[in-house]
């Protein structure tokens, strides 16, 4: 026997095909060792009696059920043989329950037997509780739809075990509750509604739990990819706007008319180009008549505008004067109005208010200007001398001759 095993091992190491006699020998060993392995597994299974306090060597119902569910997939036998093996693991009241079930239902299956054992010995929920938990299971805020479907499936299986929902109606009930309590995209919601409408009489063709999970996950992956594609586009557009010189280009000076006298109009908008616009009006502007157009719409020749550019401005850097209407049009349909700040303009040549030296009519008569200045200085000097002659506390009657 040892030589045969050695030859089989050497042939496998050399990747050579096994001879026909080796295959027949392995099948014989499998048939002979199968019952031995099964009996060894049966000996290792714990017992369940259904008593409140388990005896030595016995398990609680939950542990026994977990053990049975673990070995059932390895039992390649008929339903009758499986029930016989399960009978060997029962004692006391649990064994009597199984005998009653077999007597009342000769065609009892393993699934029906386990369901009956859960109802008798398990801690199952009442039908009212299971019904309420399932139909009140809603998607939480921030929860993914796929996680909600998994959480909903747990409550659905509990409701099926409690007997309030038939297993054949599970697909339809799952879809209806998902549409009611889930936050789905518009496309996925329409697809699921179409399924319910088309297969209303063919519930077996509705998507089951795994198919529904796949549909929801595909929709979530598509949404995530779409959001990731959109975010770089938005950031790129913001960067382009940030580096674009057009976004920071200063606006031209804005001049408007006003009925107030001697006002300065300065544009203090956010995109200020450091240019001040001064509007100077005459002392006595004419009153508008009822038939005349509004002041802001007509040109006023008596209005004078002084535009002062900042040193940093790229345009002409010298003051200029112009007459015009009260609004500046920067483009088709674009009219803007600046804020007003009142300030009195005084001419440095003639000393009069209401105009500047650039527009002074007396600019050519400089001799008269100097003469006026000399007279003013003499008057101030004479007044100061008169005050110095009067001692503190004395009364001087200026009506008497000195």
From Swiss-Prot:
Zinc finger (CCHC-type) stretch: 345-362
Top-level lineage group: Eukaryota
InterPro entries (alphabetical): PNMA, PNMA_C, Znf_CCHC_sf
Gene Ontology CC annotation, any one: nucleus
Entry keyword set: Metal-binding, Transcription, Transcription regulation, Zinc, Zinc-finger
One Pfam family cited in the UniProt record for this chain: PNMA
Natural source organism: Homo sapiens (Human)
Subunit-structure text: Interacts with SMAD1 and CREB-binding protein (CBP). Forms a protein-DNA complex through its association with SMAD1.
Region described as Disordered: 308-341
Protein encoded by which gene: ZCCHC12
Example GO molecular function: nucleic acid binding
Bias kind Polar residues: ranges: 311-322
Tagged with keyword Ligase: no
Role noted for this protein: Transcriptional coactivator in the bone morphogenetic protein (BMP)-signaling pathway. It positively modulates BMP signaling by interacting with SMAD1 and associating with CBP in the transcription complex. It contributes to the BMP-induced enhancement of cholinergic-neuron-specific gene expression.
Listed name of the protein: Zinc finger CCHC domain-containing protein 12
Family: Belongs to the ZCCHC12 family.
